[in-house]
């Protein structure tokens, strides 16, 4: 979100550009046209400014001219149709299978909370569900024999997500222990519970798994979306089509899933560079 200080900085930079661009000591704002604003945007890119920062500065200029137009200081807004440079989405970070196996195979003897954490991790990896979806799961939403879980995504949209044998095994073992620690006076029946026997909070999942990752896979930097990206990437690596991955992730449109196709392109590029004689 823009602050007054940021607007002031952006407009000061635009003013400096106008002085240099026109070669005048004073520039009439009514003389600024669309081409001038385009050159301003181009000058920012030439200076190495990111697409995001360039877009923000252009937004400041557009707002400034909207204000001038509203108060009749100019006859038109020369920036209104100037487009900001496209922001290239960064490739999602994901875990290598070996790192994940290292964490999941770590000893959890005499520590039910660690076993719960590893079950959560296994379910994250096996389903690609969001953190909010995971903590909202009730025991009745899990069908271990069918290897499916009912989750409620964005906007309360319900979907059935399959999970694998390892997740089913981990869930079966966890449920036996859960019944020992669950709070007896709960109104609902949460799948994952805290140390107090209540529905586990989102922040507890994040902090517990971050601690686990920091101790066993330094540098991996756990986030719930890291597991979501890992789930999608490993599926695509093993031949899943992008539309199936979209449905499993609960994306409303294919555009949200398209970023993973860039990963596939990067992979193909590396294979080419390693294998082709003229690479």
Model-derived features: positions:
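Conserved catalytic core of the tyrosine transesterase superfamily
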Residues: 1-279
């Amino acid at each position: 979100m823009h602050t007054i200080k940021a607007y002031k900085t952006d407009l000061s930079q635009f003013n400096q550009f106008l002085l240099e661009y026109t070669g005048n000591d004073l520039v009439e704002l009514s003389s600024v046209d669309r081409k001038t604003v385009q050159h301003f945007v181009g000058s920012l890119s030439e200076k190495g400014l990111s697409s995001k920062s360039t877009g923000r500065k252009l937004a400041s200029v557009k707002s400034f001219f909207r204000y001038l137009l509203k108060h009749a200081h100019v006859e038109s807004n020369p920036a209104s149709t100037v487009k900001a440079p496209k922001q290239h989405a960064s490739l999602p970070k994901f875990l290598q299978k070996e790192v994940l196996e290292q964490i999941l195979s770590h000893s959890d003897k005499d520590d039910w909370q660690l076993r719960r954490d590893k079950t959560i991790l296994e379910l994250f990896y096996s389903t690609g569900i969001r953190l909010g979806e995971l903590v909202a799961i009730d025991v009745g939403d899990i069908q271990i024999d069918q290897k499916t879980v009912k989750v409620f995504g964005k906007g309360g949209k319900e979907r059935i997500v399959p999970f694998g044998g390892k997740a089913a095994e981990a869930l079966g073992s966890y449920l036996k222990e859960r019944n020992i620690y669950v709070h007896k006076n709960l109104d609902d029946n949460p799948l994952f519970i805290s140390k107090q026997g209540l529905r586990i909070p989102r922040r507890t999942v994040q902090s517990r798994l971050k601690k686990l990752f920091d101790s066993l896979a330094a540098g991996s930097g756990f986030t719930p979306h890291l597991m979501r990206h890992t789930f999608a990437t490993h599926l695509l690596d093993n031949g899943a089509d992008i539309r199936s991955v979209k449905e499993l992730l609960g994306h409303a449109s294919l555009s949200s899933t398209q970023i993973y196709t860039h990963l596939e392109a990067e992979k193909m590029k590396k294979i080419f560079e390693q294998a082709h004689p003229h690479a």
